[in-house]
Design a protein with these regions (language model features):
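Extracellular/surface recognition and adhesion modules
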Residues: 14, 29, 51, 339, ...
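Structural signature of tandem-repeat unit edges
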Residues: 24-32, 46-58, 71-88, 97-116, ...
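Acidic, Ser/Thr
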Residues: 68-69, 381, 447, 469-477, ...
Length: 599
């Protein structure tokens, strides 16, 4: 009520009042308002709580004008129906933790606006709950750094009509304004912007944010751009032109509600840092970075740390030749089951500390070209599900790897603990694959026979659940009658059962059948074919020969099969009249379908 206001001081463009009802001080400004503050205000600066500027013309720089180090208890500022064309700066103008309300509306710009910077204009206004900037012409502004930084309790902010066509920097523009629930930046012209660093940093309450029309062609810095935007469920950055971006440090860190994020078209050829780029994007189940050009990247520290929902991740095309740090790179990726880093060039890497820490679902890991870095503390800590590790011989340690039984999958060397594995790997001269667990052995005793390598024993190594391979040996004058678990041949071995225990099996042999054919035979003449044979087997010999399917070897032997059981076979030595001068008679001729049967 104006009736309670008493004038305590006044000047050409200002009046200071005291409210007799509550004892509060306020000030009104009007007319031509310069950017300087008269000394007459000094005794009231620590008392004035409200400032109203109406029908005034402001000229010059109003940087830090209403700041808390000047007006120490200021709670509200209202600028209405005033000419703001001559204002050149509002930098830190309202930078005050005591301000609760700022209204800038219905103002005039009879000439082109002079305002060039709004940096920190409302920075650190921790108590600001009401803000109207509809009367602010930003068409000439080039610097909006931290403009609304730390508007900690502000829930509503309308910047939909901002003209940002001249803005070159938006660093931390809305940073740490954690209570903002809505923010319409869909019409922002960002064609001149070079930095968007931390632009939406800590906007934890935003559930929607439309940046799909952002022109990022000139942007070089996107570090922390969406840091901890924990409420965002959707974010369309698929059209971002990132060809000029050099810094993607923490770009999406903490966006833990995003279920999808399309960065497949990102041009990362100029990016030098991807540290923590996707850190704590916990809801992401897929992330396509297969086309990333990482040839300029020097740090990938914590790049995918705590991406707990990722079930797969293709980084096989990453060029890591310039990377110096991979510490924590996949730390906490608790859903990843396989990582193929076989193409990683780690020759420049100095630290891999905790690189795979707590990748609790990781089963297979390929480190074909890794080299030993200066620091690898806890590199494999928490990889409890890891059952297969293929590692370069130039990677000399596996710090944090499960202290359990492993074995060399190629040479079948068993290690009872991590220390034995470590010592063994130090002497390798080529990449080696290791499997967790105990391997089982099948010893195959040929019992007087031989395998293809002329050995009388063959040993297979498998792990539980796999299947043994049946290998058939040979023995002069005998045919093979199967594998048995005992030397008495009473318990036949079953290859169709999965591997369960180590064991030895024995080959059973049966002496061959002997068939003697008369010296002179011909099926094309009347000469009777006679066969003399001795059957030393336990089954009836029934031999069928077909010219189209059977040939005679140089050793003059035919393989005869038992028709009742084709797995039973024997070699039939042949002899006949013939000589070098009569080669025709040295050829055994059998008509198609002809059979030889002897009981």
């Amino acid at each position: 009520d104006d009736s309670d206001l008493t004038v305590v001081s006044s000047g050409a463009y200002w009046t200071i009042y005291r409210n007799t009802a509550n004892g509060e001080y306020s000030m009104r400004m009007f007319g031509n308002v310069p950017s300087s503050r008269p000394t007459a205000w000094n005794s009231y600066l620590k008392s004035i709580k409200h400032i109203e500027i109406e029908e005034a013309t402001l000229t010059g720089s109003f940087a830090s004008y209403f700041r808390n180090n000047v007006f120490t208890v200021l709670e509200s500022v209202r600028i209405e129906r005033s000419n703001l064309s001559g204002v050149t700066s509002f930098e830190m103008a309202f930078y005050s933790p005591t301000l609760q309300k700022v209204i800038i509306r219905d103002n005039d710009y009879p000439t082109a606006p002079s305002l060039r910077t709004t940096e920190y204009m409302f920075g650190y206004t921790h108590k600001l709950t009401e803000l109207d900037v509809s009367g602010l012409d930003t068409s000439a502004v080039t610097n909006m750094n931290c403009m609304f930084n730390y508007c900690s309790v502000l829930e509503e902010l309308d910047v939909s009509n901002f003209d940002t066509s001249s803005v070159t920097t938006m660093r931390d523009m809305f940073g740490s304004s954690g209570k903002l629930e809505k923010l319409d930046v869909s019409n922002f012209d960002t064609s001149s912007v070079t930095t968007m660093q931390a632009m939406f940093y800590g906007c934890t309450s935003l559930e929607e944010l439309d940046v799909s029309n952002f022109d990022t062609n000139s942007v070089t810095n996107m570090s922390y751009m969406f840091y901890n935007c924990a409420g965002l469920e959707e974010l369309d950055v698929s059209n971002f032109d990132t060809s000029s971006v050099t810094n993607m440090y923490g770009t999406f860190v903490g966006c833990n509600s995003l279920e999808e994020l399309d960065v497949s078209n990102f041009d990362t050829s100029s990016v030098t840092t991807m540290q923590a780029m996707f850190n704590a994007c916990r809801a992401l189940e897929k992330l396509d970075v297969s086309n990333f050009d990482t040839s300029s990247v020097t740090t990938m520290q914590a790049m995918f740390e705590n991406c707990t929902g990722l079930g797969e991740l293709d980084v096989s095309n990453f060029d890591t030749s310039s990377v110096t740090t991979m510490a924590y790179m996949f730390d906490g990726c608790t859903s990843l089951e396989e990582l193929d880093l076989s193409n990683f060039d780690t020759s420049s890497v100095t630290t891999m500390a905790y690189m795979f820490q707590n990748c609790t679902a990781l089963k297979s890991l390929y480190l074909d070209n890794f080299t030993t870095p200066k620091t690898m503390t806890g590199m494999f800590t928490g990889t409890t599900a890891l059952t297969y590790l293929f590692a370069s011989h130039n990677l000399r340690a596996f710090d944090g790897l499960a202290n359990t039984r492993w074995y060399d999958e190629k040479n079948w060397v068993q290690f009872s603990n991590y220390k034995e594995l470590q010592m063994y790997h130090e002497y390798q001269r080529e990449p080696t694959g290791y499997r967790k667990g105990v391997f089982l052995s099948l010893t195959m005793d040929a019992m007087g026979g031989q395998f293809e390598d002329a050995e009388e024993q063959k040993v297979q190594n498998k792990v539980s659940g796999e299947y043994w391979e049946e290998v058939v040996p040979v023995k002069e004058g005998h045919y093979f009658d199967g594998w048995y678990l005992d030397r008495n041949f009473t318990n036949k071995f079953d290859f169709s059962l999965p591997v369960a225990v180590s064991t030895t099996i024995y080959a059973k042999w049966v002496e061959n059948y002997t068939v003697v054919i008369p010296a002179s035979i011909s099926l094309n003449e009347a000469t009777e074919l006679k066969v003399e044979g001795i059957n030393r087997g336990s089954k009836t010999l029934s031999v069928g020969l077909n010219y189209e399917e059977t040939t005679i070897s140089e050793s003059n032997k035919l393989t005869l099969s038992n028709t009742a059981d084709t797995t039973v076979q024997c070699l039939a030595p042949l002899s006949w009249d013939g000589s070098e001068t009569n080669p025709k008679n040295a050829i055994l001729t059998l008509a198609p379908g002809s059979e030889i049967t002897e009981g």
